[in-house]
């Protein structure tokens, strides 16, 4: 993803949009049992920034950069290493820091102690390290601490339309500590079985915790267990940075479960905010399966307008035109498929029937449900491009 964006910026001749990288915070708590907290802070701050529209690099981008630079996960990084990671990802700013556990105050034996999180922002454009700022509170209130820190980061970035801290925290309700720990341990797990175990535990410990639901939904989607995946994806809340991606995959799950009306609703929700070609394509497929050919043709045309090089968009448009008896348009679209993909046997067969003005035969499986779906979702690429274009 990141390499694709860098290439797009280079050939487009537009200014690179400002992006922020959040690194795991370093453990100064003298307890290896709290190593997971550093990853939790990074993820929560990232989610907090993303929820306000900041372009934030993905965890996968950061892990890949560390691999390329041969940096050991979990190790405390030098200032030079922090700079190298950010620079390798073309980040504008890097958020990083450390946390420490303070002794339990007398009379508060039920407390796990207080956590002090200290953060800094490194401005890579000006090679300037900002002054440290911190949040302190009970370890049990880690989620709230992290979101308060996220609000401070937004403040330090001079983010436009910054909500009040009260409104910001209302939009990010607290999560149980044990649920947060389970979720983060799921992110850090090295096997799919461990990830599933930890994410499921996190979702059960706090039923309002959206992030593990998204992870579980994606897991079941990849296993093609669409009904179970849909159940998890439906629980991803509007305030979650993954909400629109969850809606996209929920639409695919519903489509595969033959709930075409529900799929259309999901794709419409996504298209209203992230009008990707892939989303319009899948919206058109859902509309076509509902026998709304006029709407489907319009949606497929939007996908095609965005990327005329993709043979699948030409195929879907041609196939729907053919089913609608619009043979001349179908011939044009199907020929466009074969210009881009000469070995497409299905397009060749349909083109022959369109040239003969021979429509679909009732009950013929070769004529039914031939729409081609897209399963890649590139919201980050879209948002970065919009930022670069100043929209």
Where on the chain are the PLM-derived regions?
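Short beta-strand->alpha-helix linker/helix-N-cap micro-motif
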Residues: 18-84, 88, 92-108, 124, ...
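Mid-sequence helix-capping/hinge segment at a functional interface
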Residues: 144-189
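Alpha-helical segment of the N-proximal tetratricopeptide repeat
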Residues: 175-211, 215-224
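Structural marker of alpha-solenoid helical repeat scaffolds
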Residues: 205, 238-239, 272-274, 306, ...
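Terminal, low-structured helical/coil segments at or just beyond the last alpha-helical repeat
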Residues: 339-391
């Amino acid at each position: 993803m990141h390499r694709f964006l860098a290439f797009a910026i280079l050939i487009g001749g537009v200014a690179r949009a400002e992006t922020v990288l959040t690194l795991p915070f370093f453990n100064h708590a003298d307890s290896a049992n709290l190593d997971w907290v550093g990853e939790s802070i990074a993820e929560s701050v990232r989610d907090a920034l993303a929820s306000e529209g900041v372009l934030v690099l993905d965890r996968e981008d950061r892990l890949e950069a560390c691999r390329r630079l041969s940096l050991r996960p979990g190790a405390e990084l030098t200032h030079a290493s922090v700079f190298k990671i950010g620079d390798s990802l073309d980040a504008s700013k890097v958020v990083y820091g450390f946390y420490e556990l303070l002794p339990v105050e007398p009379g508060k034996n039920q407390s796990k102690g207080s956590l002090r999180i200290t953060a800094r922002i490194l401005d890579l454009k000006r090679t300037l390290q900002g002054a440290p700022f911190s949040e302190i509170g009970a370890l049990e209130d880690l989620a709230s601490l992290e979101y308060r820190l996220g609000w401070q980061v937004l403040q330090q970035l001079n983010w436009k339309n910054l909500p009040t801290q009260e409104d910001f925290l209302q939009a990010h309700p607290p999560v149980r500590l044990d649920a947060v720990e389970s979720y983060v341990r799921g992110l850090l797990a090295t096997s799919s079985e461990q990830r599933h175990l930890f994410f499921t535990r996190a979702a059960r410990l706090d039923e309002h915790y959206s992030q593990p639901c998204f992870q579980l939904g994606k897991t079941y989607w990849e296993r093609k267990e669409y009904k179970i995946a849909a159940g998890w994806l439906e629980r991803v809340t509007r305030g979650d940075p993954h909400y629109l991606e969850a809606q996209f995959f929920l639409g695919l799950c519903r489509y595969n479960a033959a709930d075409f009306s529900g799929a259309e609703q999901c794709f419409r929700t996504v298209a209203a905010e992230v009008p990707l070609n892939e989303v319009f394509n899948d919206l058109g497929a859902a509309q076509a399966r509902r026998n709304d050919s006029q709407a489907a043709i319009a949606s497929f045309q939007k996908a095609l307008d965005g990327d005329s090089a993709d043979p699948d968009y030409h195929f879907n448009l041609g196939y729907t035109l053919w089913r609608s008896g619009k043979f001349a348009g179908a011939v044009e679209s199907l020929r466009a498929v074969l210009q881009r993909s000469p070995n497409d046997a299905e397009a060749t067969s349909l083109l022959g029937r369109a040239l003969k003005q021979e429509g679909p035969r009732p009950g013929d499986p070769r004529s039914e449900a031939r729409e081609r779906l897209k399963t890649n979702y590139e919201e980050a690429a879209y948002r970065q491009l919009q930022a670069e274009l100043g929209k």
